[in-house]
Amino acid sequence: MLKTSIAALSVLAFSFHAALAQPLASISDVSQPQRFTQWVQSRCIVSIADSAALKADANASAAAWLEASELPVEAFNAADAVIAQALKTRVGGTAKTDYRVLKCALIAQSADVQALYQQFARQKAQ
């Protein structure tokens, strides 16, 4: 009985590990709206980064999302302004912190960012 249980747990653990070991999706598998959202989040992280390494990595990530986007550069310039303004907004919680990463996630998912995407996607379609 013990051997059977151990064998079953081993198979389960191996299966779980194999599922976690799947490669990440390619940027090309991500939708255009989500590419813009991810760019916004990466650019926001550039603004809040307190280390040169994180800032450089976030800039490189933003560049990758920008290269994969079909939106005009003006969309990204407008989004930078939205990010700068939204970062001034206070976000509260139970911990005594600035919630900077949370702000970036919320900014990326905000109605303002979604509206920018829609505006520039419509212009591109015309």
Whereabouts are the PLM-identified features?
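Bacterial N-terminal signal peptides that target proteins for export
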Residues: 1-9
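Low-complexity, polar-biased intrinsically disordered regions enriched in Pro/Ser/Thr/Gly
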Residues: 3, 24-28, 90-94
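Processing junctions and N-termini across compartments
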Residues: 15, 36-38, 98
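Sec/Tat signal peptide C-region and signal peptidase I cleavage site
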Residues: 16-21
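N-terminal secretory signal peptides
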Residues: 22-68
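Compact alpha-helical subdomains of small soluble proteins
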Residues: 54-126
